[in-house]
Structure formats: C-alpha cells, structure tokens
Design a protein with these regions (language model features):
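A short, structured loop/turn motif at beta-sheet edges
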Residues: 81-88, 115-121
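Beta-strand elements of well-folded, non-transmembrane domains
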Residues: 26, 96-100, 115, 132
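Short, low-complexity N-terminal intrinsically disordered segments enriched in polar/charged residues
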Residues: 1-39
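A short acidic/glycine-rich loop-to-helix N-cap element
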Residues: 5, 101-106
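A solvent-exposed, acidic/Ser-Thr-rich amphipathic alpha-helical stretch
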Residues: 15, 30-83, 105
C-alpha cells in the first residue's frame, strides 16, 4: 500500500478509518460497520441510478454479500484523501476476486467514500464505486 500521498495526520486518520471499515467486512465482521456509518448513509450503484439509504440497509448489503460469497483476494492501492473542513472524500483503487455459486468473479475499480465529521468523529455518509471492470 502506497500511502505517500497521505501527508497530514487527519488524512492518515481517515485512511485508517477506511481500512477499519474494509477490515470489518473483509474479515467477516460486517455488523461492526454500523459504528462507522451515519444513520442516513447513502450507497449508490456504480451507474448512480440506484440508491440504498440508511445505516441498517447499507450494513445489510455487506452481510448479504458475505453470506453468498467467498473472498479469494482483496487489495487496496493508491489511497487519496481530500479534507474540506468537516467533509472528507476518500478514494482508492481496489481489486477483488470472489466466488458465488461456484463461479469466480474478478473485479477492479475505484471506491469513493464521503465522510462528515460530527462531534469529533468521522462518519461515512456516501459511497459509490467507479471504473468497475471485470478483470
């Protein structure tokens, strides 16, 4: 993981939060995601045509994925963190390989997560994927 672009402590803190979020689902504890999500978080489909709203629904999407998938590979690269007062945008490239119903999928793309700082705590408020490709 190249984190040379993460210069400030706040940028590094946000990247650490993003990694904690990913560790929750990747390591099989997706219910813990709720502590990182704002109550009204919005997940967008990669084409931005569909949305899921709310901490419970978005957390459940990870649970459903893990219940139907076996993760074979997951990597994050090129993190970028932009901070604007109480708003932050975290992006990174990812590669994932997983199995569902005896079929293996291999995808790459960019994850985009927007955070809002409330009472000295960063909460994820918006997420989407971009550049999603089957490898």
């Amino acid at each position: 993981m190249n984190t040379e672009t993460l210069i400030t402590k706040d940028q590094q803190d946000l990247w650490n939060i993003m990694q904690q979020i990913n560790n929750c689902w990747y390591k099989g504890q997706p219910a813990q995601l709720a502590e990182y999500f704002h109550d009204n978080i919005v997940f967008n489909s990669p084409d931005l045509k569909r949305q899921s709203t709310g901490k419970d629904i978005c957390t459940q999407s990870y649970i459903d994925f893990l219940n139907s998938s076996k993760i074979l590979l997951y990597k994050e690269t090129n993190p970028v963190v932009h901070i604007f007062d109480n708003t932050a945008i975290v992006t990174y490239e990812f590669e994932i390989k997983y199995e569902q119903k005896d079929k293996v999928y291999h995808e790459t793309g960019t994850d985009i997560m927007i955070f809002n700082k409330q009472e000295n705590s960063w909460k994820a408020v918006w997420r989407s994927l971009a550049n999603l490709k089957s490898a």
